[in-house]
């Protein structure tokens, strides 16, 4: 019997009706009310997520920048204190170790936020490539993370923060600010396609903060949300999920996050040659949106065909709560990636007609 890991908020899930599942070795809530309700709450109001299963790694020291420049694809030298950056770590062949966020807290002080299922692998990979006096410390068990997302998120969070949240622009953060008296790092980031904030605090403070936010947000209809809605929201916004759109066999260029790859930065980094070649000349595969014309929902690993030729496979798919359509993301041969290309998806041994459509499926109005 495998013992599942739990976040510091596990004991409060039941109070709000949380139904838990095994997610990559973690016992996490898939939903509280319903995935559809929670999804709609984030698109129209606000939702609160426990994302404390995510990993956090500190990188400090005089050589911290030089080290990060070597192990990530984006250009960390452009990051200023108080800024966040989305990036990837790659193997030498261009395959993806993980995608992550980097927060620059000080000139020699960075916080890396990595995917829960990759914590041990990522930490070992980082530690094995350390240079100079850079120090890498896994602080995942000490840090909790809450995400408040949606058009009403700022107004709700503002009730328990004295600092003006409007000053925190997209992909910026403030460290050591008080949220209902609790010291936290607050960043204007998220994984839903909506405006919102991610709040990092000590593990022991997480439950109090969760309860307080739901209390002050009750009037605006703030809902606790689970992994189900987190997945449908990120999927509509076409934000990649490691293990589906990204993997050791899929490069960031193929996955459509080439903006986070800077092959011309001065530093050499793992995967540079492959990624430079793909960025300049195009990759042989491309992540595209697909809409099913007939009945059926595309799911991960379902094959995609043109005639008898298998041209790729679905990475994620669902019945979109916002668009009310059956849509998917698929990694396919670039020759067939043009919008309006007609393809077929094999769903339960039956070929179903689909068409390549533009992404992102959903983009919020500013």
Curated annotation (Swiss-Prot):
Please list the GO terms describing molecular function. Answer: aminomethyltransferase activity; transaminase activity
Name the SUPFAM superfamilies for this protein: Aminomethyltransferase beta-barrel domain (SSF101790), Folate-binding domain (SSF103025)
**Keywords carried by this UniProt record:** Aminotransferase, Transferase
Q: What class of enzyme is it?
A: transferase
**What family does the entry list?**
Belongs to the GcvT family.
- Identification of the protein by name: Aminomethyltransferase
The taxonomy runs:
Bacteria, Bacillati, Bacillota, Bacilli, Bacillales
Q: According to the UniProt entry, what is the EC number of this protein?
A: 2.1.2.10
Q: Which GO terms describe its biological process?
A: glycine decarboxylation via glycine cleavage system
Free-text function comment from the UniProt entry: The glycine cleavage system catalyzes the degradation of glycine.
Q: Does the keyword Transmembrane apply?
A: no
UniProt subunit comment:
The glycine cleavage system is composed of four proteins: P, T, L and H.
Tell me what reaction this enzyme catalyses.
N(6)-[(R)-S(8)-aminomethyldihydrolipoyl]-L-lysyl-[protein] + (6S)-5,6,7,8-tetrahydrofolate = N(6)-[(R)-dihydrolipoyl]-L-lysyl-[protein] + (6R)-5,10-methylene-5,6,7,8-tetrahydrofolate + NH4(+)
Record-level GO cellular component terms: cytosol; glycine cleavage complex
